[in-house]
């Protein structure tokens, strides 16, 4: 398993229609975030164990997608990806971007996620609070090397959600923000979302 998909994935979650805000209730211990990640991994692996062949039947595939998606806060990831341009968008624009952005990540990275859950051996090493977020450091052995993954999580409606992944020091949220900012500066937001819509349309027929 190579590391390329780790760098490009942000993660998968159900396309949300509104921007979810971090939970404002009681403080939760950082160690609970590790428990959440471990339980999430175990659930997906249990579903994968039901497969009798390498090719997943459609119903099982959708079940796995749902569980993988549930770990991530795509509205927040979308906000971070657009950076300052997020405030310039209407609520309808934001909803559109969330749906398209999440769909692209889901379609591009599903097979790599499945490979990871089948073969990956991740060790969650530590968790600590960083402002309103909780940062979990993990290590994944890949062939002869080991990569570090830093999960950034917060509470959304009393549930842990991942909103950024830092892979060997590279933040996926920051990478997307820089890339989209350059595109918007050159061609404008409307051309960006049109290009993303086309990309998603190309991806979906190959997956369904």
Locate the predicted segments by residue:
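Short beta-strand edge/turn micro-motifs at domain boundaries
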Residues: 146-174
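Low-complexity, intrinsically disordered terminal/linker segments enriched in charged
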Residues: 167-208
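Early exported N-terminus immediately downstream of N-terminal targeting peptides
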Residues: 26-109
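Surface-exposed, polar/charged faces of alpha-helical domains
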Residues: 28-31, 35, 46, 50-53, ...
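Surface-exposed, charged secondary-structure patches
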Residues: 107-147, 199-208
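Solvent-exposed loop/turn segments at secondary-structure junctions
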Residues: 86, 103-104, 143, 169-172
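N-terminal signal peptide c-region/cleavage motif recognized by signal peptidases
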Residues: 13-16, 21
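Bacterial N-terminal signal peptides that target proteins for export
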Residues: 1-7
